[in-house]
């Protein structure tokens, strides 16, 4: 009997200890925000492609002044979950059926050269972007890049960018620079 009383007392002590335990105190907090846009298009744009940043690092003033271009930096526009059923077009006059996409870029052109994007930051530099077909992109918001053929699923469109002396005739100066270009897709 004494064993039963002792066992009961121990059980009560264990149960009551849990009732008097200190409440859990949060040790940090945060917030997660979810954003997106639903579009009426055959493809979505990968989130990392929709807002990109290209870092040219440090570029030689002397090299740019002598009409040089920085090392080209590659960037991609990734189209995801494409369903081109309603946009099919014969590719190259035969063979497989596929849809197409072209892009237009807009930004502040460097003077009359709409194929150079003006930089901000008094360095007298500009950005040039080359499309997948080796042609310079125009930043006029109207001139489309060459057509890229699409397949169902994911597609990647490759571009390169470089910094160079702008067309102002002013010498290249030291300092930080930046530029922003926006792109729009047109499917056919």
From Swiss-Prot:
Q: Which domain of life is it from?
A: Bacteria
Q: Enumerate the SUPFAM superfamilies for this protein.
A: Bacterial adhesins
Query: Does this entry carry the keyword Nuclease?
Result: no
A GO term from the CC aspect:
pilus
The entry's keywords: Disulfide bond, Fimbrium, Signal
Instruction: Please state where this protein is localized.
Output: Fimbrium
Instruction: Give the residue range of the signal peptide.
Output: 1-21
* Biological processes per GO annotation: cell adhesion involved in single-species biofilm formation
**UniProt-listed InterPro entries:** Adhesion_dom_fimbrial, Adhesion_dom_fimbrial_sf, Adhesion_dom_sf, Bact_Fimbrial_Adh_Pro
Q: Which family does it belong to?
A: Belongs to the fimbrial protein family.
Main function: Fimbriae (also called pili), polar filaments radiating from the surface of the bacterium to a length of 0.5-1.5 micrometers and numbering 100-300 per cell, enable bacteria to colonize the epithelium of specific host organs.
Name of the protein in its database record: F7-2 fimbrial protein
| Protein source organism | Escherichia coli O6:H1 (strain CFT073 / ATCC 700928 / UPEC)
The taxonomy runs: Bacteria, Pseudomonadati, Pseudomonadota, Gammaproteobacteria, Enterobacterales
């Amino acid at each position: 009997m004494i064993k039963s009383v002792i066992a009961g007392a121990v059980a009560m002590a264990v149960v009551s200890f849990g009732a008097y335990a200190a409440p859990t105190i949060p040790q940090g907090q945060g917030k997660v925000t979810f954003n997106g846009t639903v579009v009426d298009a055959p493809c979505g744009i990968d989130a990392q492609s929709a807002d990109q940043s290209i870092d040219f690092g440090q570029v030689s003033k002397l090299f740019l002044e002598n009409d040089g271009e920085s090392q080209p930096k590659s960037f991609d526009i990734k189209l995801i979950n494409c369903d081109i059923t309603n946009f099919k077009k014969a590719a190259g006059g035969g063979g497989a059926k596929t849809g197409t996409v072209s892009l237009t870029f807009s930004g502040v052109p460097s003077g009359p050269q709409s194929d150079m994007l003006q930089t901000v930051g008094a360095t007298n530099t500009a950005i040039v972007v080359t499309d997948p077909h080796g042609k310079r992109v125009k930043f006029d918001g109207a001139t489309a890049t060459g057509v890229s053929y699409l397949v169902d699923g994911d597609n990647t469109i490759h571009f390169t960018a470089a910094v160079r002396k702008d067309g102002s005739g002013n010498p290249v100066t030291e300092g930080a620079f930046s530029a922003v270009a926006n792109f729009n897709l047109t499917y056919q």
